[in-house]
UniProtKB/Swiss-Prot annotation:
Glycosylation sites: N240
EC number assigned by the record: 2.3.1.-
Record key words, sorted: Acyltransferase, Endoplasmic reticulum, Glycoprotein, Golgi apparatus, Lipid biosynthesis, Lipid metabolism, Membrane, Phospholipid biosynthesis, Phospholipid metabolism, Transferase, Transmembrane, Transmembrane helix
Reactions catalysed according to its record: sn-glycerol 3-phosphocholine + an acyl-CoA = a 1-acyl-sn-glycero-3-phosphocholine + CoA; sn-glycero-3-phosphoethanolamine + an acyl-CoA = a monoacyl-sn-glycero-3-phosphoethanolamine + CoA; sn-glycero-3-phosphoethanolamine + (9Z)-octadecenoyl-CoA = (9Z-octadecenoyl)-sn-glycero-3-phosphoethanolamine + CoA
The protein, known as: Glycerophosphocholine acyltransferase 1
Membrane topology: Multi-pass membrane protein
Length: 403
């Protein structure tokens, strides 16, 4: 039997089968018979040859796939590059907008606008009190529908939205309900008057409200606490009885505010609010509060932490502090309502009380402008002195400046 000849140096670029030779095995001699393929050595050599070419084709296939991946890789990189570029462009646009908003020019314009509106509001309010007191409730309503949505928007953006659930906002809504829905309700009038002249008015002192014309936030806080008693002062003491008879009949029915009845009505309303506040805020939003969302309780705890009452509350167990705060807030509300009969029965006392509260906010505003701006200017001056002191050539100027 002739030996099977196998070409081991066959070019790997060719196919295993020769297309122009009736599918004969490439690399085998044509003289080999078909029966010779069943010889054991020849079978092994054929197998080796097939295995070698299989591995070569497998390598070529992997190389082709790898080459296609390499071709697609630049496209993939280009897509990632364009995506990152788009993200960067959007980020820069947002940063640019934020920078423009916080820039000195925009802030100055915003402060100027706020200052102009604040001064104009004070002047218009004074004119209405003196010339058209029967229109004060309209002026109050217009401002309330401006300030409350603005307060909700700004506080929600800052994470202060739980302050909106405070008793002061309920007091304003209650007064709005009395003015426009139930002006004939005697009990609702007594409740609104007691809360306005009690809790709301004294909150100017407790919350340290300031008359800062350049700050919408400060003006809003002062409006929420001071305007309700001012509106009721004009209704009770400055409005004609003929107008009251048609528009606010409950005022004429109340000859005087009895302390016991006012405390009883206010206590019932306060209890309803406090129950709602505890379950909706203290319990329902406990996780958010623990994560750092401020409430009136956390703010007052920090603001009065150095006082005797603040230190006493801080020494109590953590789970008891909110309940103690509720009791203190209730006692504060009832205490501030005690002199309401004086304000209601005497026009002069009511005027003096409102002047005192408003003067307190003016003093707080003056303290802010002088102390805060003064300290800021002092820091800038100290930084300038330090900069001049670090420059040897300007030592003379530094000493002259320090004098």
């Amino acid at each position: 039997m002739d030996h099977l000849e196998f070409d081991e140096n066959t070019d790997s670029e060719y196919s295993i089968f020769e297309e122009d030779n009736d599918y004969g095995l490439h690399g085998l001699d044509d003289s080999v018979g078909f029966t010779d393929l069943f010889d054991a050595p020849n079978i092994y050599r054929v197998y080796s040859w097939l295995h070698k070419h299989y591995n070569q084709k497998k390598g070529q296939l992997k190389h082709g796939v790898s080459r296609q991946k390499n071709k697609l890789q630049p496209i993939h990189k280009q897509i990632n590059y364009e995506t990152d570029k788009l993200k960067e462009r959007l980020g820069k646009s947002i940063d640019k907008f934020q920078e423009q908003w916080n820039s000195g020019k925009v802030v100055r314009f915003r402060d100027k606008l706020s200052f102009a509106l604040g001064v104009s509001t004070c002047i218009l309010t004074a004119l209405l009190v003196g010339m058209a007191p029967e229109s004060m409730h309209l002026w109050y309503t217009i401002q309330l529908f401006v300030y409350l949505p603005l307060r909700y928007y700004t506080y929600q953006r800052k994470g202060y939205e739980y302050f909106i659930a405070d008793f002061c906002y309920w007091g304003n809504i209650l007064l709005l309900v009395y003015i426009w829905i139930f002006p004939e309700s005697r009990r609702l009038f007594i409740l609104s008057y007691s809360i306005s002249y009690g809790t709301l008015a004294w909150s100017v002192v407790a919350w340290r409200n300031s008359l800062l014309f350049h700050s919408i936030d400060k003006i809003t806080s002062l409006f929420i606490h001071f305007f309700p008693p001012l509106v009721l002062h004009t209704i009770v003491h400055l409005t004609n009885k003929s107008y009251l008879k048609d528009r606010f009949p409950a005022v004429l029915k109340v000859k005087k505010i009895d302390l016991l009845s006012s405390v009883e009505i206010a206590s019932f309303f306060y209890a309803l609010w406090q129950i709602w506040y505890y379950f909706f805020i203290q319990v329902g939003k406990q996780k958010q509060i623990q994560e750092g969302r401020p409430t009136s309780f956390t703010w007052l705890s920090k603001a009065y932490s150095k006082t005797k009452l603040g230190r006493a509350v801080a020494k109590l167990p953590q789970n008891l502090q909110p309940f103690v705060f509720m009791i203190i807030q209730y006692l504060y509300s009832i205490t501030t309502m005690l002199p309401c009969s004086l304000w209601y029965n005497n026009k002069l006392y009511s005027t003096a009380f409102l002047a005192l509260i408003f003067g307190w906010s003016v003093w707080n505003g003056a303290s802010y402008y002088i102390d805060v701006f003064g300290r800021r200017f002092q820091k800038e001056l100290e930084a300038l002195r330090q900069q001049l002191a670090e420059t040897p050539t300007n030592s003379g100027s530094s000493s002259a400046l320090s004098r």
